[in-house]
Amino acid sequence: MAELPMSTHLFARLLSRVHAVCAALIEEGALPAGIDLSRVVVEPPKDASHGDMATNAAMVLAKDAKAKPRDLADKIADKLRAEELIDQVAIAGPGFINLTLKPAVWAEALRAVLDAGAGYGRSTVGGGEKVNVEYVSANPTGPMHVGHCRGAVFGDALANLLDTAGYDVTREYYINDAGAQVDVLARSAFLRYREALGETIGEIPEGLYPGDYLKPVGEALKAEHGAALKDMPEAQWLPTVRATAIAMMMEAIKGDLAALNITHEVFFSERSLIEGGRNRVAETIEFLRAKGDVYQGRLPPPKGAPVEDYEDREQTLFRATAYGDDVDRPLLKSDGSYTYFASDIAYHKVKFDAGFANMVDVWGADHGGYIKRMQAAIQAVTAGKGALDVKIVQLVRLLRNGEPVKMSKRAGDFVTLREVVDEVGSDAVRFMMLFRKNDAVLDFDLAKVIEQSKDNPVFYVQYGHARGHSIFRNAREVVPDLPEDSKARAAMLRQAPLERLNDPAELELLKRLALYPRIVEAAAQAHEPHRIAFYLNELASEFHALWTHGRDLPHLRFIINNDAEITRARLAMVQGVVSVLASGLAILGVTAPDEMR
């Protein structure tokens, strides 16, 4: 059998064959010309006993073909039986087509893993499209807390995933440095400045930030300005103190993110929208006004419970209802300043004008009600050419042995990100923050994430990678020329008699490896990096189970002392496993250790 092209994974290749069969049926008149094949998929069947792959082609094409799904399935199945890769074709239920592939396919799929090495799973599905992923964007008013941590990890892993799938990714952080909260920060820092000068400031007043983390800001202000700011009116000292406090908070935030191996290419200041000789917020409002999307009007009172920001007055409104929102939205406050929404529209227009028609924002759970208006605004400012996907990241409940963790005294009222990373490590934080879908509340137990057991997914997956390398070290008694270098080892092992990997458990593991590129593409298109974490856990579980079988059934051991050829074949399978585990862990931003102590 000819080798599979490395650039095309099995599922994509089978889909192309199904499309070719449909094209032949169009030629024969069994399908109408121009029929839409975009809904046709090839995927693993829900029940593995039904085969290796399944297609819905007959189900989704039957209506346009004016045929019964089962009858159309018969025609498609007849042609698929002639395909080189396919061993058996069966029609199930109303017209699903189940495919069983020839055993030799899985040996060639393993060779594709070995040939691609670290590049296995990389895809061109993104086509180089530019995508902007904005994540974290925590207010620069204090250290990052554990709630920020989940959004940071999710956004970073999503950016890695999109890059792996062939998108041109920019990682961006939006600095909220123009709102009232940074003035509160400045007043809080000014108290710490007075404290640094020797004053007794007493208890921090209600409404200011109480944490000790602002003491270094006070010391820095003293070092730079001495007592010069102390007796100035607030209007004079506030801009200076605010700028210093924001700069120091952002450096602290960058340090917190670095502890999780997170970096951004772009830090965009909200204040830059209205400073520097150009007011982009005003420009955006006028741009929308010229389109008829901004008008002067009054909003009706909200139904049900009162809304805090409702004002019964004539105001400048964005016609959000024309783009699917429930109500039109104010752009100016009663004091003439811009609403946060107005700044947000301008910010996203800047991104679109920079070439990002594809934008992803990662927001906290408390911003869910903001999505509709923002997506309406994107449609308006991009004339329907831009797309915004908002990923909501739910809350994290921090536990220790099932009990809630007490708050941090230094931070004031929350547990800091740095405290969590220092205790359990970046790998445990990143993996476990991704081991649940982003829109579900996550329980993060500080004791359980460092357990060395199969009940701890991060340990289980990393141990799979380490176990693979342990097998390589032990195999040198049987295969003394086994290279240390991963590429050289893969090049040697691809020559092994891989067709001897015919035990059902071995074949299942090879099938799991062949699934990985499809998982990457599907996860990238859905913006769901948790799918990678789930897949890695399943792969590691199958690998560990096969190793355990070898303890009980000597003929299934990875290393057979008197059979170098089957040993080489099984080492090739192990090489495939460690390559895919390393690739997936890299997407998640988690290390792949060669040994664990």
From Swiss-Prot:
Alphabetized UniProt keyword annotations: Aminoacyl-tRNA synthetase, ATP-binding, Cytoplasm, Ligase, Nucleotide-binding, Protein biosynthesis
GO biological process: arginyl-tRNA aminoacylation
Gene Ontology cellular-component annotations: cytoplasm
CDD domains: ArgRS_core
InterPro entries per the UniProt record, alphabetical: aa-tRNA-synth_I_CS (IPR001412), Arg-tRNA-ligase (IPR001278), Arg-tRNA-synth_N (IPR005148), Arg-tRNA-synth_N_sf (IPR036695), ArgRS_core (IPR035684), DALR_anticod-bd (IPR008909), Rossmann-like_a/b/a_fold (IPR014729), tRNAsynth_Ia_anticodon-bd (IPR009080)
Catalytic activities: tRNA(Arg) + L-arginine + ATP = L-arginyl-tRNA(Arg) + AMP + diphosphate
SUPFAM superfamilies in alphabetical order: Anticodon-binding domain of a subclass of class I aminoacyl-tRNA synthetases (SSF47323), Arginyl-tRNA synthetase (ArgRS), N-terminal 'additional' domain (SSF55190), Nucleotidylyl transferase (SSF52374)
'HIGH' region (motif): residue ranges: 138-148
Gene3D superfamilies, A to Z: Arginyl tRNA synthetase N-terminal domain, HUPs, Isoleucyl-tRNA Synthetase, Domain 1
Entry's Gene Ontology molecular function annotations: arginine-tRNA ligase activity; ATP binding
Domain of life: Bacteria
First-tier enzyme category under EC: ligase
Coiled-coil annotated residue ranges, if any: none
Location(s), subcellular: Cytoplasm
EC id: 6.1.1.19
Assembly, per entry: Monomer.
UniProt cross-references to NCBIfam families, sorted A to Z: argS (TIGR00456)
Family listed: Belongs to the class-I aminoacyl-tRNA synthetase family.
Protein name per Swiss-Prot or TrEMBL: Arginine--tRNA ligase
